[in-house]
């Protein structure tokens, strides 16, 4: 009795103690440069835009326009590329005066500004006297196209304005040209890219046939361009060192197209290069009109959601978030990534954006299309291990235990594909969350059988002993190297707890009996608390072994903590203890850079496990943001804000892509920075 009274007295004091601890915790690393590399801030905020402070990268900021795989590559320096997917060509601007010429990437002064969806440059150089050129680049809103507007200001009459385009091979790159996976050089105008390029010069424009097919001996793709009035010529891809060299060279078998602009009183010039099909390649392109529409779309999207805080480094988030979220939408579903991994995988975090951004129609379309992808038969199947994968996976064949009734295939509106992830778990969580935002009884009645079949499928495959604890089979972002061999896993059990809890509420809305879902939810929560909670450590175990001594894994990843909190498994005291575990046991990596006006920024890796391997010990943006959310949910808003701020500032301002959402951070121990708008 005395012990119980003491516990009741000490518990709230301990909660306050934990909540008051600085987020630096005991795991903060010594203030040294990461990998002995000093950093300088890359971009800084200016209103809703990002202005270059220090950098000389090319092709590090993608512009999206049409909700397809097409994008325009821009960067710190004003050299551009089209990606279709596949290399669609490289575009350069140049200037000259008398015998001297250069590409503008070599200009004396370049001011670079990224406003979500649009890149702007101001070019100053000794060749231009006291004048300058202003460039604005967009991706077309209605077609797969590159749009460039150039405005001149006080440019001497003797200055020449030149342009060059070429190198459209149609070749896809390893990871579609993404940061950290493919080198910048894949977008350079490499002479070999120009092989089999066939140009047809027209008045103020051209068409280009490219993407050679050796079997049919024909080109498979077409670009159509409208360019400013002026001289138009073909040159050699071997002679592109500067505009003067290009003009003096002899045409060979690796052609490029170049021109010199007839500078006019209008002092404004447009380029429009579109990826077209045979029946659209002869249409008249209205460059100014296309530019206006693209600018309107980019601006509308960037202003869909606005932040107004005392920190200008966070006020840009609304525009970048909406732009990146729009980039992963390709009707009828959200994709895995905007650049790399631009493919259908139904359960990564992207679809959660839809309701937050007011795209309830997109959310509904996404969920419907994957509801159509649910396997309906057989009712169940045998467990068949894949011998080609060292028996680590189930054989990817429909009709086996995993790929039976209730399984949801990776492609929308197709239920005939087996794949090695349990994408059901997170997808259903997103679907259930949709109904927290939307009172949609008609859709609920339509989709509820999908939820029912999913819950039965999860139970049948991952809680085979009916103890309320579920195995994890490649079910979350970090799952690639996580293996539990049929064990009882905290985070998947937490997902199933929330799923059954919300299914009970939705069943009641439909007039169905919710009791079975309530009973399963209670069983799961009790099992997690009784078998997976570690009272001495104040955290949940990662999992419990299924065999042998049924040992507990007592060093959980941060996903175990934040998923348990997000799914409302722990009580208030347990939340604080579990968050304290992250402070105490997970390393904290200082974020340092010259010119960064923030102090005490730091990130966390996903685990303290060794040795490093992919997906097990990463410094990942989304994982840090999910942990920040858990800190807010767990009653430590100051720490949550600090981690939230740290992750976003590091990604959007220190990272390679201005306003970009990386997958992995510069601080990842082995891979370093990886991907953008992921």
Across the structure, where does each feature detected by a protein language model lie?
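Terminal accessory carbohydrate-recognition/targeting modules of carbohydrate-active enzymes
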Residues: 24-316, 345-346, 356-362, 636, ...
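Active-site cavity-forming subdomains of large catalytic enzyme subunits
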Residues: 431, 454-458
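Catalytic cores of carbohydrate-active enzymes
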Residues: 315, 380-384, 463-478, 485-491, ...
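Substrate-binding groove/exosite segments of carbohydrate-active enzymes
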Residues: 180, 245-252, 258, 296-445, ...
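Amphipathic, well-ordered alpha-helical segments in soluble domains
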Residues: 89-93, 117-119, 366, 423-430, ...
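Bacterial Sec-dependent N-terminal signal peptides
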Residues: 1-29, 150
């Amino acid at each position: 009795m005395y012990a119980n009274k003491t516990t009741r007295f000490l518990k709230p004091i301990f909660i306050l103690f934990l909540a008051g601890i600085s987020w630096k915790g005991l795991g903060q690393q010594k203030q040294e440069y990461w990998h002995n590399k000093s950093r300088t801030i890359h971009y800084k905020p200016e209103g809703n835009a990002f202005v270059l402070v220090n950098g000389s990268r090319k092709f590090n900021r993608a512009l999206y326009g049409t909700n397809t795989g097409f994008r325009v590559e821009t960067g710190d320096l004003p050299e551009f590329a089209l990606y279709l997917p596949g290399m669609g060509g490289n575009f350069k601007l140049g200037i000259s005066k008398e015998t001297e010429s250069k590409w503008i990437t070599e200009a004396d002064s370049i001011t670079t500004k990224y406003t979500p969806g649009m890149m702007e440059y101001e070019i100053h150089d000794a060749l231009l006297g006291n004048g300058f050129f202003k460039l604005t680049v967009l991706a077309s809103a209605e077609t797969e196209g590159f749009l460039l507007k150039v405005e001149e200001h006080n440019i001497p009459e003797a200055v020449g304005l030149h342009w060059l385009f070429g190198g459209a091979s149609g070749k896809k790159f390893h990871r579609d040209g993404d940061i950290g996976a493919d080198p910048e050089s894949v977008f350079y105008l490499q002479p070999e890219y120009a092989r089999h390029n066939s140009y047809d010069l027209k008045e103020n424009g051209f068409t280009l046939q490219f993407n050679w097919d050796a079997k049919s001996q024909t080109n498979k793709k077409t670009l159509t361009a409208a360019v400013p009035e002026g001289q138009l010529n073909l040159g050699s891809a071997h002679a592109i060192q500067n505009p003067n060299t290009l003009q003096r060279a002899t045409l060979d078998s690796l052609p490029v197209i170049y021109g010199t602009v007839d500078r006019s009183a209008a002092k404004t010039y447009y380029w429009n290069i579109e990826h077209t099909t045979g029946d659209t390649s002869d249409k008249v392109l209205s460059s100014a009109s296309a530019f206006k529409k693209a600018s309107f779309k980019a601006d509308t999207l960037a202003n869909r959601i606005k932040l107004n805080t005392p920190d200008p480094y966070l006020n840009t988030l609304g525009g970048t978030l909406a732009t990146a979220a729009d980039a992963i939408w390709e009707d009828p579903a959200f994709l895995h990534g905007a650049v790399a991994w631009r493919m259908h995988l139904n359960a990564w975090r992207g679809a959660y954006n839809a309701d937050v951004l007011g795209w309830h129609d997109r959310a509904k379309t996404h969920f419907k299309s994957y509801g159509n992808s649910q396997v309906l038969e057989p009712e169940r199947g045998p467990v068949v291990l894949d011998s080609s994968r060292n028996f680590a996976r189930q054989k990817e064949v429909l009709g086996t235990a995993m790929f039976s009734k209730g399984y949801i295939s990776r492609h929308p509106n197709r239920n005939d594909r087996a794949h090695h992830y349990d994408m059901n778990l997170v997808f259903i969580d997103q679907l259930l969350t949709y109904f927290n935002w939307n009172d949609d009884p008609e859709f609920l009645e339509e989709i509820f059988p999908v939820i029912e079949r999913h819950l039965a499928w999860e139970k049948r495959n991952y809680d085979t002993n009916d103890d309320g604890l579920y195995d994890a089979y490649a079910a979350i972002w970090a799952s690639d190297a996580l293996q539990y061999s049929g064990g009882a896993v905290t985070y998947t059990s937490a997902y199933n707890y929330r799923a059954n809890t919300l299914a009970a509420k939705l069943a009641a809305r439909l007039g169905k009996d919710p009791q079975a879902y309530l009973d399963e939810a209670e069983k799961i929560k009790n099992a997690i608390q009784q078998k997976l909670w570690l009272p001495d450590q104040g955290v949940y175990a990662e999992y419990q072994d299924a065999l042998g001594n049924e040992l507990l894994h007592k060093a959980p990843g941060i996903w175990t903590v934040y998923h348990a909190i997000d799914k409302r498994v722990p009580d208030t005291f347990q939340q604080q203890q579990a968050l304290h575990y992250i402070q105490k046991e997970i390393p904290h990596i200082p974020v340092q850079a010259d010119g960064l006006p923030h102090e005490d920024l730091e990130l966390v890796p996903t685990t303290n496990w060794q040795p490093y391997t992919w997906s097990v010990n990463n410094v990942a943006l989304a994982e840090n943001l999910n942990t920040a959310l858990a800190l807010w949910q767990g009653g430590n808003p100051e720490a949550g804000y600090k981690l939230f701020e740290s992750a976003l500032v590091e990604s959007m301002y220190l990272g390679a892509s201005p306003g970009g959402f990386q997958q992995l951070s510069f601080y990842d121990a082995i891979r370093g920075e990886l991907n953008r708008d992921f």
